[in-house]
């Protein structure tokens, strides 16, 4: 009998408390970058019933109305009704932002490689904003080269948001979660969806029967291809029986608490660093994007069915301390060849990544819900496949 295995990933909607915090942090980042592309930003957000706290470190000469940015973001998400316990116009906003530490700024603004040497490459100028390790991943089981469980999980909560905002399902409220379990065969290929879990906030008048019927017919069956569903697929819709109290009224939220949702749903390793609220000198963010860029182009080039890229940095140093590529036995060339090619083709210094991916632009708010990787609804530079030919040529 062939061996089959299950793998599960989850996603959350833009109205989930942690995602509200992520979106506020990235909206602040975008507002600052729109006025000052050279700004250094590390904006953290905490949300709970009736209150938002924004704190962190920022170095910029630009003025941004933090209060307005926070309220506009909350309204865009859909928290515009005081009955939700969290509303854009009535929430208390408490900003507490200070200047970036000069000790950190010293290493970021003048990398180890250029100190005392005026003849260095200008892209050596910016040092990594911190030490750390980052991972990027790609796999050929979906069109967007993402693991199927996280891809489906994101699409389910995005569909819920579309139905809520269009008014097609009028009783939906902003908070929601999804979880998808996929069955893989002995060749590690997805063959069916075993379980779908969806919890969605709703008005008190909505019945469980109505919610169950709408979610299955208008969400699940619209998102998940019928070839993956069968009579053994299990659906759990609002399994607690009631989800009226949600959002920050139900749970507090913090920036950076959904790092697995933001990336690969647990299918790949994670270095632990969050993305939202951080400008691109923070390699937690920029190097994770670069690693995805490398992995996706490797798989798209047919050099592996699955690829995981690890990058690691030392604070204040421009060049990565290590580059590691793992193809899990699916590669068509040696991993050492791929690593050499990656170093040749992709500039992995922080300034090189920023230039390569054009990361000084205000593009981050759109990434802060429904995943930073594998997005087909928005144009993200690390999702482009413009290095495929160069990789093929480099490993000949």
Curated annotation (Swiss-Prot):
GO biological process: one-carbon metabolic process; S-adenosylmethionine biosynthetic process
UniProt region (Flexible loop), positions on chain: 100-110
Keywords: ATP-binding, Cytoplasm, Magnesium, Metal-binding, Nucleotide-binding, One-carbon metabolism, Potassium, Transferase
Xref: CDD domains: S-AdoMet_synt
A UniProt-annotated Pfam family: S-AdoMet_synt_C
Cellular component aspect of the GO annotation: cytoplasm
Keyword Cell membrane in annotation: no
Catalytic reactions on record: L-methionine + ATP + H2O = S-adenosyl-L-methionine + phosphate + diphosphate
SUPFAM superfamilies found in the cross-reference section: S-adenosylmethionine synthetase
Binding site for Mg(2+): 18
Alphabetical list of InterPro entries matching this protein: ADOMET_SYNTHASE_CS, S-AdoMet_synt_C, S-AdoMet_synt_central, S-AdoMet_synt_N, S-AdoMet_synthetase, S-AdoMet_synthetase_sfam
Protein name per UniProt: S-adenosylmethionine synthase
Gene (UniProt): metK
